[in-house]
Regions:
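Acidic, small-residue rich beta-repeat scaffolds with periodic aromatic anchors
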Residues: 22, 109-207
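N-terminal signal peptide c-region/cleavage motif recognized by signal peptidases
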Residues: 13-15
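Short glycine/acidic-enriched loop and turn motifs that connect beta-strands
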Residues: 62-65, 119-121
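Acidic/hydrophobic-patterned starts of short beta strands in beta-sheet-rich repeat architectures
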Residues: 50-60, 107-115
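Short, surface-exposed coil-to-beta transition loops
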Residues: 53-56, 67-69, 99, 123-128
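Beta-propeller blade termini
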Residues: 39-48, 99-110
Length: 207
C-alpha cells in the first residue's frame, strides 16, 4: 500500500512538472521563450537591472489549459534576452486562479503586479506587489492592499507597506477618515518565489 501511495505521489508530481515546462535560458523575444502550444498573454518592457538595456517581464498562457507562466528576462546589449526568473503559476496564477492577475508594469527599475483577490463576503482585495532586483534576486520591497466594497466598488481601507524603509501606512476612507503610520521590524525581504497572492497579508495593528 505504501508503495502504491508513493508511486501515485510521484506520478502526480510528474504530471505537474509536465504541465509547467522549463523555459529556455535565452531567446530573441518573449514569443521565442514560449514552448509549443503557448502564447504571450502579457508583456512589459523596461530596465530592471540598471544596465541601461531594456528587459522584459512576460506571461505565457497555454493554448488549451489556460495555465500561465511568468518569465523575467534581462536584455543583452547585442539583442536577445537571458532568462532570470521563471514562475510556474504559484505567483502569477495563485491556486490556479488566472482571473486574479490584473496587470503589471515596470517603473523606476521596479516590477509591479496588480491582483484582484477574493476577500470577505462584502469586500475584494486589490493587492499590489512591488519587486526590485537586488541581492541577485527579485525581492519584495512594497505591498499595498485596497479593501474594495463589492456593493458600490468603493475603496474603504488602504494599507501600504514599504519594506525598504520598514514603514506601514494605514488609511481609513470611511466616515471617520483617518491615516496612521508607524515603523516596524522586518528581518529578511521575501523573494518573488516566496510570495503567493491571496496568502500574503499584513495587518497594521499586528506590526
Amino acid at each position: 500500500m505504501n508503495r502504491l501511495i508513493a508511486f501515485a505521489m510521484l506520478l502526480f508530481a510528474g504530471t505537474i512538472a509536465a504541465q509547467t515546462p522549463r523555459l529556455p535560458k535565452s531567446a530573441a523575444s518573449a514569443q521565442d521563450f514560449a514552448p509549443e502550444g503557448w502564447h504571450v498573454y502579457f508583456i512589459e518592457n523596461g530596465d530592471l537591472n540598471k544596465d541601461h538595456v531594456d528587459d522584459i517581464a512576460f506571461i505565457l498562457q497555454n493554448n488549451d489549459s489556460g495555465s500561465r507562466i511568468l518569465g523575467i528576462a534581462f536584455g543583452k546589449k547585442k539583442r536577445g534576452y537571458v532568462l532570470q526568473e521563471q514562475d510556474g503559476g504559484r505567483f502569477i496564477a495563485p491556486k490556479g486562479n488566472t482571473d486574479a492577475f490584473v496587470d503589471m508594469s515596470i517603473q523606476n527599475g521596479t516590477l509591479r503586479f496588480n491582483f484582484l483577490l477574493p476577500g470577505s463576503h462584502a469586500y475584494d482585495n486589490d493587492d499590489s506587489f512591488i519587486f526590485r532586483f537586488q541581492n541577485k534576486r527579485f525581492e519584495l520591497i512594497g505591498w499595498e492592499r485596497k479593501l474594495r466594497s463589492k456593493k458600490n466598488d468603493r475603496v474603504n481601507e488602504v494599507t501600504s507597506v514599504n519594506f525598504s524603509t520598514q514603514t506601514v501606512i494605514y488609511e481609513d476612507r470611511t466616515k471617520k477618515s483617518e491615516t496612521r503610520q508607524k515603523h516596524f521590524d522586518y528581518d529578511r525581504l521575501k523573494s518573488l518565489g516566496e510570495v503567493v497572492p491571496g496568502e500574503f497579508s499584513m495587518n497594521y495593528d499586528k506590526l
